[in-house]
């Protein structure tokens, strides 16, 4: 499931695995059906349906197999004209098709037809012809205006995806051997931006982690300050056994620093002293909660420690041995961050780093125990990983949907 909507607007919907659009407020869902040369194809009931989110952005591409090709649906939202969800259906086959939608409250270049044969659909459904190797574009208005003429010069799916990726990269950018990890990072950040963090009463730790991600992506910190302060107190009281508690309090401090609220930072310092004995022990498995997942990934690359930050604190994933990678803007406390790249020289990794903000003492206890540096930028040659031969291709071929640090 994918959340869609335009930032700055309140309209939201869920895109199902088969490309249906289910608004969160009291509006009818929009399903789609394809009439090909052989029969009607209903994506919800078809076995040969494949959906992807290129790069992790909330731009879905759903493919339905039809004779001699695919019907390819793309769904994405834009803020233009009061907010629109754009639906494209591309006919990749050499024969014409028709596409039916289960209600007619759509913007289109030409009106759809209500004459639908061969399939039973809800009253008010409409159908549009799509020529061979051509694309139909319609849109759903977020203001509920109903049917009308489709505006011209709307942003493209590719352009919208680029915008979401750029927003995610403001928080941190990861260029990893396992691309699925970076894609999921983008996806989870987009989900946070559209759906917001969990309620602090439900999970104060996740709330703080999520708010910090949003602020790092460009949201203003001030509206979050009262809830963040209360959530930090609640998390400290209730989360003593939570692996992410120290990172959540660190995240809260970054929000206060971004807002220039020194008093909140001082108050938080007292809270952090009360739980100073709580250690950050990263779980082996990736969390499912978006904010916790993002924190887990970043903390496996760089994590704040007393007086500094540790790079690759869980060690170098064996499947990354021999593969170059680089990461940018990982938080190390307050307004500080670190970027670093690993380049291989034979069996030995070389690290190049640059710190933003006040330089901290960097270390890599699991990868290079003897290495430490408080320089703002530099490079060093780390020892060869013990007992691990370089991987020629750089990473495992199949790491699954969530990526792999193994």
Describe the residue ranges of each PLM region:
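Terminal accessory carbohydrate-recognition/targeting modules of carbohydrate-active enzymes
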Residues: 1-184, 282-406
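Catalytic cores of carbohydrate-active enzymes
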Residues: 260-289, 307
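Substrate-binding groove/exosite segments of carbohydrate-active enzymes
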Residues: 165-271
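Short, well-ordered alpha-helical packing segments
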Residues: 86, 102-104, 229-232, 249, ...
